[in-house]
């Protein structure tokens, strides 16, 4: 009987809609399991650290971009169990997103570009909303790299609530990143293009093609409503509530409309008196306010990822760039003759450095409110000239082809890795601000933007390895982790002392990485997740396309 059952289990077991292919191995003890499966004690320890029996919840939740699925993947840490796929730019029949469910169909319609339906996306850089530079867990923002769009996800429901199309960009890579209190969501262009939706030949590249950084204003009180539960809470705090039940579940657009509606029931003077308490207990829905948003014009370099200053550097943001050589389509600056055309990659990598764009976004906000912008495609564009005159826009050389600008928890340092440079560079904001204040500029770029001196702004430079990309911070002061794409490693190093502390081998070709709250004012450390682009020979073969995988590392 046992032999018969075992032979059946070695075949295919079909149960409901699930197919299980494989063998059943019986064991009575850990030692037998270790022996039969060839496991070590370290393997068992790793399994015990990540195993979560039913009912035990994870310590952390990770939001990961789904790439060209157009979704966001949600999984737990340390279990690494997938909890949900959030539908964003792509219809999702299992959840009814975009299929018959009216609200989601309307949200997808918001993503139309020039009247064309675009029901796919390339999700890339998710960002959690923050208060005081720490995650508050209220909203998640995600960009579409292929079609320049940004989506708002409400984490009360883990559902997409808004899609906004960038009216100026034709592509983007550097989004989304939030300022410390989620005043703005930062989105940067990738490939320079004419802002106007019309053809311009490459002969006009320097005059007509532009990059840019958009600051999307986020309004947490875009929609307000009252529930019976919130009315009970208001009553307990001494707020008059007579007549408020008639307002339950009605949505009001913005604070002014909400307070006016409440004032009609309890009196306008009472509504103003208790406004703070009313807003505290109201149900809020945050949305991007496009009419309060603006873009800072940038030269036709290829802008990349960004970060927002915090603490010492709050009010400023930084954005990487590549191709400051201005090789587009293989044509260099002033060179449009086919016979002089260079290989694209060679032309884009000719210089040893590219530029970090340093923006005083609070100064840009003042320019916007003062009307120092022009409308392009119905959107506010602040010219480079206005930014330079306001002492609000600077360039700083950084290692060639950078992909990562990561500001320290105290806001005093920014770490930049150049993909084509083995060094990772640490800049010191005190030095940067001193150069700005003294107007100590090394040069001016062709569009009049002051260029700071790289060496004068540096704190240190460390040789970390081949293909450095992104950096995340540990809870231990000075300790960071940087991904090494070519070496397939994570390097642990001290950015204050400027020395490498160790390296961790990774499965294969790490790209992004994350540590627990590693981009906030108070990193937790504990865990590191390596987001590996390839996983050659690591898993069961599933066809010619190699699977990607996320690798959990204990950094305690």
Can you say where each PLM-predicted feature lies in the sequence?
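Predominantly soluble domains enriched in secretory-pathway, periplasmic, or organellar proteins
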Residues: 26-556
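Bacterial N-terminal signal peptides that target proteins for export
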Residues: 2-13
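Bacterial N-terminal signal peptides
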Residues: 12-22
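Short, intrinsically disordered low-complexity segments
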Residues: 5-7, 18, 36, 286
């Amino acid at each position: 009987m046992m032999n018969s059952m075992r032979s059946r289990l070695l075949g295919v077991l079909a149960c409901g809609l699930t197919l299980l292919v494989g063998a059943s191995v019986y064991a009575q003890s850990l030692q037998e399991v270790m022996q039969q499966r060839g496991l070590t004690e370290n393997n068992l320890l790793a399994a015990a650290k990540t195993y979560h029996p039913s009912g035990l919840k994870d310590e952390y939740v990770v939001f990961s971009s789904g790439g060209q699925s157009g979704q966001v993947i949600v999984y737990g840490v340390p279990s690494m169990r997938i909890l949900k796929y959030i539908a964003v730019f792509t219809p999702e029949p299992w959840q009814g997103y975009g299929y018959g469910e009216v609200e989601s169909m309307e949200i997808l319609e918001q993503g139309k570009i020039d009247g064309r339906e675009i029901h796919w996306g390339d999700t890339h850089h998710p960002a959690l909303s923050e208060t005081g530079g720490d995650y508050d867990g209220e909203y998640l923002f995600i960009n579409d790299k292929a079609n320049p769009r940004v989506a708002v996800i409400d984490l009360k429901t883990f559902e997409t609530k808004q899609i906004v199309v960038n009216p100026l960009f034709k592509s983007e890579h550097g989004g989304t990143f939030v300022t410390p209190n989620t005043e703005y969501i930062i989105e940067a262009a990738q490939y320079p293009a004419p802002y106007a939706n019309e053809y311009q030949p490459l002969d006009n590249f320097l005059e007509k093609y532009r990059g840019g950084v958009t600051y999307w204003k986020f309004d947490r009180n875009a929609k307000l409503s009252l529930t019976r539960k919130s009315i009970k809470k208001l009553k307990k705090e001494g707020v008059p509530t007579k007549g408020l039940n008639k307002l339950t579940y009605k949505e009001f657009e913005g604070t002014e409309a909400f307070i006016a509606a409440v004032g009609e029931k309890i009196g306008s003077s009472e509504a103003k008196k208790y406004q703070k308490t009313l807003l505290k207990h109201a149900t809020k829905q945050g949305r991007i306010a496009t009419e309060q948003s603006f873009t800072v014009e940038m030269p036709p370099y290829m802008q990349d990822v960004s970060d927002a200053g915090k603490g010492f550097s709050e009010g400023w943001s930084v954005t990487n760039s590549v191709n400051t050589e201005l090789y587009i389509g293989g044509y260099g600056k002033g060179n449009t003759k086919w016979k002089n055309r260079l290989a694209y990659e060679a032309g884009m990598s000719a210089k040893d450095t590219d530029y970090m764009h340093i923006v005083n976004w609070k100064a840009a906000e003042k320019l916007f409110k003062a009307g120092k912008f022009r409308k392009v495609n119905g959107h506010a564009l602040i010219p480079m000239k206005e930014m330079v005159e306001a002492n609000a826009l600077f360039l700083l050389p950084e290692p060639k082809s950078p992909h990562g600008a990561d500001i320290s928890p105290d806001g005093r340092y920014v770490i930049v890795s150049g993909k084509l440079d083995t060094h990772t560079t640490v800049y010191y904001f005190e030095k940067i601000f001193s150069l700005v204040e003294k107007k100590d500029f090394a040069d001016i770029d062709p569009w009049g933007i002051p260029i700071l001196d790289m060496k004068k702004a540096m704190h240190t430079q460390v040789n970390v390895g081949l293909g450095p990309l992104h950096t995340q911070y540990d809870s231990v002061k000075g300790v960071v982790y940087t991904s090494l794409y070519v070496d397939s490693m994570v390097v642990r190093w001290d950015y204050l002392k400027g020395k490498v502390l160790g390296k961790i081998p990774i499965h294969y070709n790490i790209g992004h990485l994350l540590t627990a709250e590693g981009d906030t004012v108070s990193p937790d450390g504990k865990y590191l997740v390596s987001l590996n682009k390839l996983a050659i020979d690591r898993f069961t073969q599933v066809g010619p396309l190699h699977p990607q995988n996320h690798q959990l590392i204990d950094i305690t």
